[in-house]
């Protein structure tokens, strides 16, 4: 085994550890000139990509430092994508680099038995997205996917719009002996059985889970409420309930639940816009779980300037770095309130579809010079 092979093996064996990745970057700098083409020509760029993505992962989320590191990495990856990831094109629909190496892949459920062993053998993959065609003539059960032993190193599982509606598939997922280390789960856009969701949240399955995406499931309001208020054993740091029809009294109970008391990223995009969202009936400053909140998306609630004022009264808003206020009827007065706030220190602000003028946007840019302003 060559030194390069040994370093790569160490990365595969310790996917959470940055040290082997940084050692590999150093090795590329020192030995890249002796590699065969085309690795020789791209060795310095590969080392730089590893370091910049690790810098991104360690930086304060959404900060200018993180953005610069991400942009630098993207330029390098775009230049060398085929060279660094071409070996997976036969197996993966898409792939993404994480901390300098391919760490996220998208595969088709129908090919999982052939694809999973191949992709996990060559790269430190910890995140996987499963695609399943909706056409019934090519229907593929996901039960076999959840039996794959390769999933034991997966921490992020994404099943967006996979047409999962059968309880048996959800039970196969939660009963899988290979998903015990799962920390992030996306079930966005699936016809999730409400009874299953409530029982899952209350129950012991997937105990390491800290991030859950249930977005674009309008029917889940009562089920997610019943589950979260009884899920004191869970500790979510990221929760996406966007597009779920939730009544104000239900949302108040969710926001006060122990399960999300330490949430850092909370997405509550309202799917009933232009009708006002449930947050318009609540005191924003007091119902939101502020302790660790750094990302808050309130898209579509129609809060207006009064809602912005309620939001800004809470001192803990100083912890926010990402704020989504699209489709909230802010107008010039809402902009004035945001600009006058002495607490906010934002790196991202979404104010799309708020009837703002270029002057309003310029005022926000002046107030938040380090922020990306979407309008």
Residue ranges and their predicted role:
Residues 104-115, 128-138, 156-165, 184-192, ...:
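Concave beta-strand-loop units of leucine-rich repeat
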Residues 2-95:
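Extended, charge-rich alpha-helical interface modules
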Residues 89-93, 98-102, 110-119, 121-129, 137-147, 149-156, 166-175, 177-184, ...:
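Leucine-rich repeat
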Residues 65-175, 179-184, 188-189, 262-282, ...:
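LRR N-terminal entry segment and analogous cap-like coil->beta motifs
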